[in-house]
A protein has these predicted regions:
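Surface-exposed acidic loop/strand-edge motifs in secreted or periplasmic proteins
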Residues: 33, 44, 49-59
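Extended aliphatic helical segments
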Residues: 11-14, 20, 31, 49, ...
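A mid-sequence interfacial segment
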Residues: 75-115
């Protein structure tokens, strides 16, 4: 399945002969098609949608998951990015946290139960 970015705020694909469009008011950070699951992963701008800015959609355009951010003892503003590798059920994501400008929190995100785990700091290069 092919996903097309219309612009910074809109993506589309074809499902059963019909076009599916997803639009946001602000920039979409990242889009991934998860071939094995036949689902789309979209990271939207947290300033538009809040901390729950990670969305998983099925190919018909229905939301499969929109997980709450984990409680890690500090504010989590949302997901910054995913280091997506096709076929892996546990993916590495980088969380947006305001407390430290030199390091960010990375963790594992399960594509099975949509939970976050295995938190650690990673160097952030500005």
């Amino acid at each position: 399945m092919k996903i097309e970015r219309i612009d910074d705020k809109t993506v589309k694909w074809v499902y059963n002969g019909s076009e599916v469009n997803l639009s946001f008011s602000r920039k979409i950070f990242q889009v991934e098609f998860m071939e094995a699951a036949q689902q789309f992963l979209i990271i939207a701008d947290y300033r538009e949608v809040g901390e729950r800015n990670l969305f998983i959609y099925d190919t018909s355009g229905k939301i499969v998951a929109n997980p709450a951010m984990p409680d890690i003892g500090t504010t989590v503003e949302g997901v910054y990015s995913i280091w997506y590798i096709e076929g892996k059920t546990d993916q590495t994501v980088v969380l947006l946290t305001p407390q430290n400008q030199n390091y960010e929190t990375k963790c594992k995100f399960s594509l099975i139960d949509f939970t976050f785990s295995h938190f650690s700091l990673t160097k952030w290069f500005h």
